[in-house]
């Protein structure tokens, strides 16, 4: 699973996920991409589950790029603990996703195979996505 090797600070504020993605909004590495049109958070487990679904479908052909990285820690308190007494420990890492962000890219496969692989991957993600092609303008 993806997570930072080390961070400057262990915990972060929750923050607000607003605006549209300006960086990482174009397909830059592969020929096909999976773009988010919804807003939300992707955990490292969800990112990995989608990657596995794509990899299994395209078998040996093609190459996949993961364009997002979970760098925001989400803390949580243990079960049955009273409120207060400080912030909980970091439990997992998430990537904040704005609409327009390209999540995955693929190359070296035909369009039908890429579409089906991205459809399987999108089923693992908690937001709406759309299939994009590089030369048609992402």
From Swiss-Prot:
Any idea what this protein is called? Large ribosomal subunit protein uL16
Functional description taken from the UniProt entry: Binds 23S rRNA and is also seen to make contacts with the A and possibly P site tRNAs.
Give the PANTHER family listed for this entry.
Answer: 50S/60S RIBOSOMAL PROTEIN L16 (PTHR12220), LARGE RIBOSOMAL SUBUNIT PROTEIN UL16M (PTHR12220:SF13)
Q: Which UniProt keywords apply?
A: Ribonucleoprotein, Ribosomal protein, RNA-binding, rRNA-binding, tRNA-binding
Q: Which GO biological process entries does UniProt record here? A: translation
Task: Please name the InterPro entries in this protein's record.
Answer: Ribosomal_uL16, Ribosomal_uL16_bact-type, Ribosomal_uL16_CS, Ribosomal_uL16_dom, Ribosomal_uL16_sf
Gene Ontology cellular-component terms for this entry are: cytosolic large ribosomal subunit
Identify the coding gene.
rplP
Q: How does the annotation summarize its subunit structure? A: Part of the 50S ribosomal subunit.
Q: Where is this region: Disordered?
A: 1-20
Family to which the UniProt record says this protein belongs: Belongs to the universal ribosomal protein uL16 family.
Basic residues: compositionally biased ranges: 7-16
A Gene Ontology molecular function term for this protein is: rRNA binding
One Pfam family in the UniProt entry: Ribosomal_L16
Say which species the protein is native to: Nitrosomonas eutropha (strain DSM 101675 / C91 / Nm57)
């Amino acid at each position: 699973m993806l997570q930072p090797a080390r961070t400057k600070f262990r915990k972060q504020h929750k923050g607000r996920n607003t605006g549209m993605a300006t960086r990482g909004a174009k397909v830059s590495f592969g020929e096909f991409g999976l773009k988010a049109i919804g807003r939300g958070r992707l955990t490292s487990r969800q990112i990995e589950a989608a990657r596995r679904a794509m990899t299994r479908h395209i078998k040996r052909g093609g190459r996949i790029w993961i364009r997002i990285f979970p760098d925001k820690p989400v803390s949580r308190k243990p079960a049955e603990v009273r409120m207060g007494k400080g912030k909980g420990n970091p439990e997992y890492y998430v990537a904040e996703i704005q609409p327009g962000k390209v999540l995955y890219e693929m190359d070296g496969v035909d369009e039908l195979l890429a579409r089906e692989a991205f459809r399987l991957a999108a089923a693992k993600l908690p937001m709406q996505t759309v299939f994009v092609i590089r030369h048609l303008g992402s």
